[in-house]
Swiss-Prot record:
Region (Important for binding to DYNC1LI1) location: 2-435
Organism listed in the record: Homo sapiens
Cellular component terms (Gene Ontology): centriolar satellite; centrosome; ciliary basal body; cilium; cleavage furrow; cytosol; endocytic vesicle; endocytic vesicle membrane
Comment field on protein domains: The RBD-FIP domain mediates the interaction with Rab11 (RAB11A or RAB11B).
Name under which the protein is recorded: Rab11 family-interacting protein 3
One Pfam family it belongs to: RBD-FIP
Taxonomic lineage: Eukaryota, Metazoa, Chordata, Craniata, Vertebrata
EF-hand domain sequence ranges: 202-237, 234-269
Length: 756
């Protein structure tokens, strides 16, 4: 984790001469106003730093030094001696960023004014306004390069030296490497970052909460795999853009400073999409307000991380652990470089690529100064890797440039977006050592040659740097152990995957063998089924052939029977014709008999009516005679009474005679009814015979249009046999019918059958 190094332990600084008379608040400390106090590359100018008490002791002769001391960044032993004052040096100003002593402060003697270095006509030294410095370095008074055409900060102005806090109040002592400004090691505190805009300090706690939620193991770094796994809800392209902002160097891990810088770049609309590269904004412009999309992003990201379980990536290699060649290298952070690289650097901090690029223009470095054209309309300083290739001895942990170390004096640039490290380049240890050496030996030859006194430095800087390097060595050992554990875990995973692949191959072979066996079994079953179907088909064909032979034999037999059947049919036809002739003759005779019967019936009815009239007349006559007989009997009875017979005998005889006469009349009436019924029966029998004859005529009314031989030849054997059976049935019915008619005639009227 790229955290700020703690303060050097007490007693590590070598003793020096007594400080100025009066201490930090004495008269010697107040003689800073008449001239520019001292100009240090990347060193602060101003009052005390509340966060670094007791870190840097007052340097011997710091107040008595009448000139301005120059240092190329935090490297030790690069301070210069006093320089002659120049007319172009502006007076230092006091304010919240750097409290310089007033001109009327008492002191033992006047201090000599150190002029600013003489610049070419294109540049001039100007003091940075107090509202332009980063919020985390309020006591610094940085100076900027400014074009001679303008005395104010404009679009073409570029920060060259970053502001850093002063070591003690009232003195401008030499800054002691990367360990001089002690920062709190707890990153959970919401101090504004060096590159944090003034108007967005309230975003620090929210971003810290999001970062802590993403940092599941609590080591201060978020792996790219974890972040990609979390941010996949935004889409592949958006995740790629986010990782480009949050990890521009391609190290595979994200620190909180990188996270904050990336979110700030996204919020400010960085066109290049890189956290540490960009364009210096105008000083007078207010910081951009946080858009609603940024608030939504932070809120959604925090909710997503707190609601979802942290899942570590165990299947892919991190980008920081992959091996690259000399052509694909990136700048190694000084706080995360290996121990060998730190030792080869000679204890110096990260070089100032701005000055290194000015020294090596032939290797692709480019310095864009104010007043010169730029593709984006702004003046930037960009360090581009040269064409030189160096071997990379050993493996070491590499990380991005931390904005916190940028603010603490690691780089001599006031803007954390000053350097633009290429995400696809990675420098070797020799390259880093060369940069560190050049940074330590840099004398600003492009601007002005400093005095030889700048190469002197206190011994306490070396002690602090040794402590710093020891801590870096411990951190690198921890990183190496973590890398070894990860490599062992990946090797274990690889072994498991190999075993799994072998198991899958064996399973595949077993499946193939099983499939072959199944294919063979199915082929055998199909062959057996085919043989069975062929046998059944052959048996069925044999049965059909046998059946066909039987049908042929039956057909031949039926053909042999056909002539006999034809002869029988002809004989039956002759008999039928004879019967039809007889029926015709009988029909004629029947019609004649019916005519005679009708005439006889008419005659009979006439006689019956005549008989009925005679009967009625006879009945009336009988009635009259009976009455007369009764009258005569009464007279006879009276005469017998007169003769003396008894009346009872005569009355009984009278009744018996009357009863006898009634019975005789009843007998005659019944006989008449019997005769009437017989006549009706005869009439009904005649009607039955007539209807039977008409039915016989209808049966024989069918006309034969074709000859019997033609009909027989045109039909099949089955149809012929069926027709013969029907004809035999009809003949049998006709024979039976004729017999019944003859029997009925013989019973009713046998005279019809008599030959006349």
């Amino acid at each position: 984790m790229a955290s700020a190094p703690p303060a050097s332990p007490p007693g590590s600084e070598p003793p020096g001469p007594d400080p100025e008379p009066g201490g930090p608040d004495g008269p010697g400390a107040a003689q800073l106003a008449p001239g520019p106090a001292e100009l240090r590359l990347g060193a602060p100018v101003g009052g005390p730093d509340p966060q670094s008490p007791g870190l840097d002791e007052p340097a011997p002769g710091a107040a008595a030094d009448g000139g301005a001391r120059w240092s190329a960044g935090p490297a030790p032993g690069l301070e210069g001696g006093p320089r002659d004052p120049g007319p172009s040096a502006p007076p230092p100003r006091s304010g919240p960023r750097g409290q310089l002593a007033s001109p009327d402060a008492p002191g033992p003697g006047p201090r000599s004014e150190a002029p600013l270095p003489e610049l070419d006509p294109l540049f001039s030294w100007t003091e940075e306004p107090e509202e332009c410095g980063p919020a985390s370095c309020p006591e610094s008074a940085p100076f900027r390069l400014q074009g001679s055409s303008s005395s104010h900060r404009a679009r073409g102005e570029v920060d060259v030296f970053s502001p850093f806090p002063a070591p003690t109040a009232g003195e401008l002592a030499l800054e002691q490497g990367p360990g001089s400004p002690p920062q709190p090691s707890d990153l959970s505190q919401t101090h504004p970052l060096p590159s944090e805009p003034v108007g967005s300090q309230e975003d620090g706690p929210r971003l810290r909460a999001v970062f802590d939620a993403l940092d599941g193991d609590g080591d201060g770094f978020v792996r790219i795999e974890d972040f990609i796994q979390f941010a996949t809800v935004y889409g592949a392209e958006q995740v790629k853009d986010l990782t480009k902002y949050l990890d521009p160097s391609g190290l595979g891990v994200i620190s909180f400073e990188d996270f904050y810088q990336g979110i700030t770049a996204i919020r400010n609309g960085d066109p290049d999409g890189q956290c540490y590269g960009g364009v210096a904004s105008a000083q007078d412009e207010e910081p951009l307000a946080c858009p609603d999309e940024f608030d939504d992003f932070v809120t959604y990201e925090a909710n997503e991380v707190t609601d979802s379980a942290y899942m570590g990536s165990e299947s892919t290699y991190s980008e920081c652990e992959t091996f690259t060649d000399e052509d694909t290298s990136t700048l190694v952070h000084p706080e995360l470089q290996p121990e060998g690289d730190a030792d080869s650097a000679g204890g110096s901090a990260v070089p100032s690529e701005c000055l290194d690029a000015m020294e090596e223009p032939d290797h692709g470095a480019l310095l864009l100064l104010p007043g010169r054209p730029h593709p984006h309309g702004q003046s930037v300083i960009t360090v581009i890797g040269g064409e030189e290739h160096f071997e990379d001895y050993g493996e070491g942990s590499e990380a991005e440039l931390s904005p916190e170390t940028l603010c603490n004096g690691q780089l001599g640039c006031s803007d954390p977006a000053f350097l633009t490290p290429s995400p696809t380049k990675r420098l070797s240890s020799k390259k880093v050592a060369r940069y560190l050496h050049q940074s330590g030996a840099l004398t600003m030859e492009a601007l002005e040659d400093p005095s030889p006194e700048l190469m002197e430095g206190p011994e306490e800087d070396i002690a602090d740097k040794v402590v710093f390097l020891e801590r870096r060595v411990l951190e690198l050992e921890k990183d190496t152990a973590a890398t070894g554990e990860q490599h062992s875990r990946l090797r274990q995973e690889n072994l498991q995957l190999v075993h799994r692949a072998n198991a899958l191959e064996e399973q595949l072979k077993e499946q193939e063998l099983r499939a072959c066996e199944m294919v063979l079994e199915e082929t055998r079953r199909q062959k057996e089924l085919l043989c069975k179907m062929e046998r059944e088909k052959s048996i069925e064909i044999e049965n059909l052939q046998t059946r066909l032979q039987q049908l042929d034999e039956e057909n031949s037999e039926l053909r042999s029977c056909t002539p006999c059947l034809k002869a029988n049919i002809e004989r039956l036809e002759e008999e039928k014709q004879k019967l039809l002739d007889e029926i015709e003759s009988l029909t004629l005779r029947l019609s004649e008999e019916q005519e005679n019967k009708r005439r006889m019936g008419d005659r009979l009815s006439h006689e019956r009516h005549q008989f009925q009239r005679d009967k009625e007349a006879t009945q009336e006559l009988i009635e009259d005679l009976r009455k007369q007989l009764e009258h005569l009997q009464l007279l006879k009875l009276e005469a017998e009474q007169r003769r003396g017979r008894s009346s009872s005998m005569g009355l009984q005889e009278y009744h018996s005679r009357a009863r006898e006469s009634e019975l005789e009349q009843e007998v005659r009436r019944l006989k008449q009814d019997n005769r009437n019924l017989k006549e009706q029966n005869e009439e009904l029998n005649g009607q039955i015979i007539t209807l039977s004859i008409q039915g016989a005529k209808s049966l024989f009314s069918t006309a034969f249009s074709e000859s019997l031989a033609a009909e027989i030849s045109s039909v099949s054997r089955d149809e012929l046999m069926e027709a013969i059976q029907k004809q035999e049935e009809i003949n049998f019915r006709l024979q039976d019918y004729i017999d019944r008619i003859i029997v009925a005639i013989m019973e009713t009227n046998p005279s019809i059958l008599e030959v006349k």
